Design a protein with these regions (language model features):
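Membrane-embedded alpha-helical bundles of multi-pass transporters/translocases
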Residues: 1-497
Length: 498
């Protein structure tokens, strides 16, 4: 977890520098919108195979001692992913103007909440150019992500956990050294540099693995390759709906007043700091562990591991969620309000963070529970649930955006609220199905952990509310940092006495 915390420190540092340089400007809106397309390509082609199909299959081969077949499978998956990503990214670069004009400017999704920014030729040109630059990233991330899965399958987590920090360092280099002469394009080039370092930092760990071999093969003669494709199919469908939901949110925000896309990006990034440090660090380590327990025919061990992870997760995610909700304004002010990031930008980001923070627990639990399904070679259940809930999210996003506009509220907050509601429902349904699948979740222990976290969280919330009332006229440094320290202290005391 320490490596993930280091990664989030660098991520936060890069966000602070980006906000100082670009704020919630048209240029940064274009950068975030352009970044969405490469991210979708990577998630569909590489991440789906990695999370649900490749790691469990590869881990199973390692557990059975068939290392050569495992490396043939790994080589085949790397080769296929690289070929597909190069082809898709090349075509996307050629048709970038069409993608921006007809996808990011989709008129049906912007109906009723669109402003004049859609007719801004500068915003359009920024987005097209940034999209073409960033389309190199999915190729780099595809290879790097598979290396991460290979290394994690050997129960080695340090170097892969440090990889996200490299991406943030690349962005920092882009802001400090490239943006002064290249403007927003400097950030895009820094992003590519970070993507390259994301893979390079994992090479030392890869070279230390036993019997590492690379084969020039597409694995057509391997039944495990077909198994990966079989498992990947439903997962790709699920990822497609998740990414469609994310794309719809970006499209809606792209048509809202200037700064909405950036505000969504900053606020979601702040929510993701505890989510990555707590939930994703646990989930990445959990998948190989769950897969090995299933391969050894010990589902009861997996049930115990999952229950323990959920209890630990709730004890950390609940106070993190409440802390972000209460301290959102001083935290955003302290971290971002400087340079081109003004008071209005702070209000926009804090408004979205209010709703995103409410969904932190849901996002965190889904990260863990979905890994349990993948380890059981069941990709259909989480995909089906994800498709239904993400479709619900799209509907809520469109409906809430109109309602918020009608009430005179900043409409980008509607997208965050819809996301949190849909994710909470997804969490509940996945917990119901996994409980049936593995014959329980040690419910009494899990419920006890939940109630203790909620009780201590309630005490912490009362303390933070009083703190904010008392410290209103004081320095934002004192309010934010003191609030965090107070929250941690009160929560720990509360946990010890409930």
């Amino acid at each position: 977890m320490f490596a993930f915390i280091i990664g989030q420190v660098f991520s936060l540092a890069s966000s602070v520098l980006i906000s100082w340089k670009f704020g919630t400007s048209v240029e940064y809106d274009a950068f975030i919108a352009a970044n969405k397309i490469p991210d979708i390509i990577y998630q569909l082609v590489a991440a789906g195979a990695l999370a649900s199909a490749f790691v469990p299959t590869f881990t199973g081969l390692l557990t059975r001692g068939d290392r050569e077949r495992g490396w043939k499978l790994a080589s085949a998956v790397v080769n296929w992913v690289t070929i597909l990503l190069i082809g898709i990214c090349t075509l996307s670069a050629i048709f970038s103007p069409w993608i921006v004009r007809n996808v990011l400017n989709a008129p049906l999704l912007n109906h009723g909440v669109v402003d004049a920014s859609l007719a801004d030729p500068l915003k359009f040109q920024y987005t097209v150019n940034l999209l073409r630059i960033q389309l190199i990233a999915p190729i780099l991330f595809g290879i790097s992500g598979l290396l991460m899965g290979i290394i994690n399958s050997h129960q080695s987590f340090l170097w892969p956990a440090l990889a996200p920090a490299m991406l943030s360092i690349g962005k920092i280099v882009g802001v400090l050294f490239l943006a002064p002469s290249m403007d927003i394009y400097g950030l895009a080039v820094g992003f590519l540099l970070g993507a390259l370092m994301h893979g390079l930092i994992q090479l030392p760990a890869l070279t230390k693995l036993p019997m590492v071999k690379y084969f020039f093969t597409l694995g057509k003669d391997l039944p495990e390759t077909r198994e990966v494709v079989r498992l990947m199919g439903p997962r790709v469908l699920g990822v497609a709906f998740v990414q469609l939901n994310s794309l719809v949110n970006t499209i809606i925000a792209y048509g809202l007043p200037t700064g909405s896309v950036g505000a969504i990006g900053y606020s979601f990034g702040l929510m993701m700091i505890p989510e990555i440090a707590i939930a994703q660090s646990m989930a990445i380590a959990a998948l190989p562990t769950f897969s090995a327990q299933v391969a050894k025919g010990k589902p009861e061990d997996m049930r115990a591991s999952l229950s323990a992870l959920l209890r630990g997760l709730l004890l950390l995610a609940i106070p993190a969620s409440l802390g972000l909700i209460f301290l959102r304004v001083p935290l955003v002010t302290l971290l971002y309000q400087r340079g081109t990031f003004d008071g209005h930008s702070t209000q926009m980001v804090a408004w979205a963070l209010l709703f995103y923070a409410a969904g932190l627990v849901g996002h965190s639990v889904v990260e863990i529970v979905s890994r349990a399904f993948y380890a059981l070679h069941d990709t259909k259940t989480p995909v089906f649930v994800g498709v239904v809930m993400m479709s619900f999210n799209v509907i809520l996003s469109l409906w809430f955006a109109g309602l918020f506009t009608r009430f005179g509220w900043m409409p980008h907050g509607a997208l965050a609220l819809a996301n949190s509601l849909a994710t909470f429902l997804e969490m509940c349904v996945l917990l119901f199905f996994i409980r049936r699948k593995i014959s329980g979740l040690e419910g009494r222990h899990t419920l006890d952990g939940l109630l203790r976290a909620l009780a201590a969280g309630a005490v912490m919330s009362a303390a933070l509310w009083a703190w904010l009332q008392w410290t209103q006229p004081l320095s934002v440094w004192l309010v934010a940092i003191g609030g965090v320290l107070l929250g941690v202290l009160v929560y720990q005391i509360g946990r010890a006495h409930v």
